[in-house]
Swiss-Prot record:
Transmembrane segments: none annotated. Disulfide bonds join C41-C53, C44-C59. This is U-stichotoxin-Hau1a. GO terms for cellular component: extracellular region; nematocyst. Toxin that is lethal to crab. Does not produce the typical symptoms associated with sodium channel toxins in crabs, suggesting that it likely does not act on sodium channels. It comes from Heteractis aurora. Its main location: secreted. It is found in: Secreted; Nematocyst. The keyword Secreted applies. Residues 22-31 form a propeptide. Residues 1-21 form the signal peptide. Belongs to the Hau1a/HC18/HC19 family. It comes from the Eukaryota.
Length: 62
């Protein structure tokens, strides 16, 4: 029964990534979520829980 749970979890993660506008050319950036090497985001961007860089509306200038 446990393998079925992992399979369902994998399918759910895949569907979530599809809903986020996943494209094959985005694969290296998507894969960086699970790798120890994390690329830095541009200025005024922050990394969300999907690992993508999101632009901040009120840009906090450092």
């Amino acid at each position: 029964m446990k393998p079925a749970i992992f399979l369902m979890l994998f399918v759910a993660m895949f569907l979530i990534s599809e809903g986020e506008g996943f494209k094959p050319k985005d694969a290296p950036q998507e894969r960086s979520v699970f790798s120890p090497v994390v690329q830095s985001c541009p200025r005024c961007h922050r990394r969300d829980h999907f690992g993508k860089c999101r632009k901040l509306d009120p840009c906090p200038d450092k």
